[in-house]
Amino acid sequence: MLGQTHHFRTYAPEKIEYAINRYTKEAERLYKILDNRLSDHDFLADEYSIADIATFTWVRPRKMQGQNLDDYPNVKRWYDTIKVRPAISEGLSVLSDNMKWNAKPGSKEWENMFSASKK
């Protein structure tokens, strides 16, 4: 669901309000579930696991999903805990050198990402 949110909010060649609203609200619903789970757990599976690593990668671009961690205090605590772990921190530094958030893809990137010609 969060990938669809990214697509319709950031990448879609035409802005479709229904799709933007639908997936933004779905992202909000998922963040609420995550916040509830983390209200009495330090990590998603009680101990740090691949579930945390995988979910972290989807929470990181939250602005593209129309979400603010201030609205989800348990997710914010969890996110802040995960991002300073040595391997995560090292990975983020590699990404910061190679990735631009919200950059509009050119024709070649569009083809690679969506396997379709840009309109």
Regions found by a protein language model. Give the residues of each.
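Residue-level signal for well-ordered alpha-helical positions
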Residues: Q65, V94-L95
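Conserved C-terminal alpha-helical bundle
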Residues: M1-H41, V59, K63-Q65, K100-K104
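Short leucine-rich amphipathic alpha-helices used at interfaces
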Residues: E14, N21, G66-Q67, E109-E111, ...
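Residue-level signal for nonpolar/aromatic packing positions in well-ordered secondary structure
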Residues: L34, D52, I82-I88
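GST superfamily/GST-like fold recognition
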Residues: L2-H6, F43-D71, K76-T81
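Acidic/histidine-enriched, glycine/proline-rich intrinsically disordered or flexible terminal extensions
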Residues: L95-K119
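Surface-exposed helix-capping loop/turn segments at secondary-structure junctions
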Residues: N36-E47, A87-G91
